Amino acid sequence: MRSHLARNATTTTPNVYRRLHAAVGHHHGLLRPCSATALSARRCLFDCQHDVAHIPRDVALCTRTSKRTFISLFTPKPERFVKLPHFDPGYNVLLQYRKSEVEQERPPPRDQLVTAFKKLTKFKADTNRPLNPNQAFLLRTVLHYLLVTKPEADAPVDLKMSDLENAMDAALLPPKGSPEFHLALARLLHEEIMRRRLILLNPEERKVHLTKDDFARYIKALTQYGGSLEAAGRVKEFWQQLKDERSAVYFRGSGRIWIMVLEGLANEGREEELLQFWEEAQETGGIKYIPGVHQIFVTYYARQDKIEETKQWYSKPIHSGFSPTGETLLELVRSSRRSSQKWNEWLLPVFEQVVQDKFAKKGSLDAFLQWSVLALDKGPDGIKTYLQTMASGDFYQSHEVKVDATTINRLMQAAQEKGNPYMAERFWQLAQDFNIKANVHTYLNQMSYRLDANDIEGAHQIFSKLASGAVEVEFDEDLPVMNKYLRVLCAQQEPNIQHILTITSALEQRHAVLEPETIVALCLVFLNHDKKFDVIDTLSLHSVSISHIERQQIYKAFVDYICSPQTTTDRAWDAYSLLRQYFPETSVDDRVRLMESFFERKKPDMACLVFGHMRAHDDDNMHPTADIYVRCLEGLGRCPIPEQRPSDPASSLKMVHNMLKMDTRVEMNTRLYNALMLAYAAGGDPFTALDFWEEHITRSAEGPSYNSLAIVFWCCELIPLGDRYARPVWQKMLRMDLEVPQLGLTYNALPDPVSKDEFAAWAKEEYPEEWARLESKGQKETEFQGPVFNITRLFEA
């Protein structure tokens, strides 16, 4: 093994992790070797096993400018350390396995993989944090490897049934991104669980086995992740199997399986299959029209704003005389917000019936209160009467009916939906009249509506209470509001950077992963305030913990920032350096856009570096095509580098030309030679440009194009006695009856005032109207060529 490959195989770095994440998303796991610019012999940024203060040349543009006073010369500032990323337990081992698999190296030891699998799935299940798509993909890949490779004969069973069940619990936590890999993981887990259970059971025990929750969990995965049609077929097959084995009587809780499929079909918008499966559920499974089923059908039609169907399913008698659930009524309230008039006319008697029911449930009454705020425009004074009735206990018989923090929270949410933060604050004051103690959701609602009102100080007061432990926060339920808080702070005209860093530090201690929109907001505000190390910290901490879709969202924002005319060139280049370091999966189209943005900034040297990084990328799919070579050379033709001569071996043009010579995937054609002529002529070397014309274009089977002719005449303008080169070409054009260039371009190309006067006299006589229009554009004087018309001359390859 070559030395640098051996070192990379034994040294796991965050840079490798970022590339692994990029590979899992962009290539569905087809990891490419690291580029020499992103991970080289100089070592990558933030080496976990070495001093993190050693930053490579790749990010030298991100270092701070040294500023010292006289006294500080003797008391140097402490060195700034880059924050290392936090990995979920076991995740780094899974990444190492994927790297070894793609690069065909020896994988980590089996016991390490088993331990990593157990740690990650147990951590996710215990903390209620969903797997992101990358983690689900890697878990599925490692599990497949562990199942197809056998452990040593004397080794204990490495993955126990409880480990597989933990993994299934983790897979069932709904992710933010695509659930494709979660479903694949759940399938493999279910197959292995079923295999292990059946292989250990005799026929009599198998009947008891069928009462287990394995099948229900698998159906939940299917219905949750878009496989409801398959789930419907599985349920019918499973039920028939139970009947054939006379085991249906042992299977308790079968109703929830049928209901899960109904809910999945409704969520996927499959109306025909939903109605058909409902008929089968009644006939085969004996499912009744219970409140849960009532909620599924009413919610399905209400979300589609089909009021007649909603009325029909709502009015159907519920089994055993039960009342609709509170969630059903809440969905009707949401529908009334979309088209209030026709819904409220129907909902008025519906909620009157709810309020007058002595046995009404608390959820139904809370829904009524929300509807009163949203539809009837009731304020705190009007709601107070209802709350007093609920709190008295004289009318409603259910012991659950009481005024608590949940009631106030829903009223505050209704006020927020109306865009009235002042009303939401009054509802909180109303809660104090009833001696209601705030819970975590109360504080989060307060923080949210204060942010909506741009009350930064008020939101900070709530943040301080949460940070001091006024209430216990479980399962990161405060993260959505904290992300919103950070985004609002970043959007201020003069952001308080220190305040932002205080919040991010508090979240970092919890190892919380921010939303991609928040990461973008933080990075941009830090870039705009030249806080480059804070950008590095933000990307280092979060870029390895998010899915490839979220990574794409972040790098797209970086590309937009770099290409924005409002961004200074220095900041744009700093942002590009970080983009290249942390997001090697940046698409070719975006890289071309970056290259052209630097050409537009009149920074061709930077544009050529972007092109060079594309050419040096280890992923062949990222290499420039012939069209991209042309666009780069055209850019050099528009804005050459004044201090560089094309013949200089270190020039940007020479670098691009050498890359083209060495690129075996690109076949030379007239368009490429045209682009080379443009670049060399613009760079001050028209003779080399004419060599391409004489030695390649005129002798090729493809021959010159109209653009070739325009470019070669321009080259002739740039050299002494250029008419000697131009006349033979011109004569050939006349013989072939080709289209003659416009009058203005021809006039401007003539080398001296005498020739221009002769041409003008001829043009006035032959084309009087065209010449008059040309004269209306005006002229300007040049030092050697005399007057020229004010027309823009653009060349394309």
Swiss-Prot record:
The keyword Transit peptide applies. Chaperone protein involved in the assembly of the mitochondrial NADH:ubiquinone oxidoreductase complex (complex I). GO terms for biological process: mitochondrial gene expression. Keywords: Chaperone, Mitochondrion, Transit peptide. One of its GO terms (molecular function) is mRNA binding. It comes from Neurospora crassa (strain ATCC 24698 / 74-OR23-1A / CBS 708.71 / DSM 1257 / FGSC 987). One of its GO terms (cellular component) is mitochondrion. It comes from the Eukaryota. The gene is cia84. This is Complex I intermediate-associated protein 84, mitochondrial. Its main location: mitochondrion. Residues 1-69 form a transit peptide. It is found in: Mitochondrion.
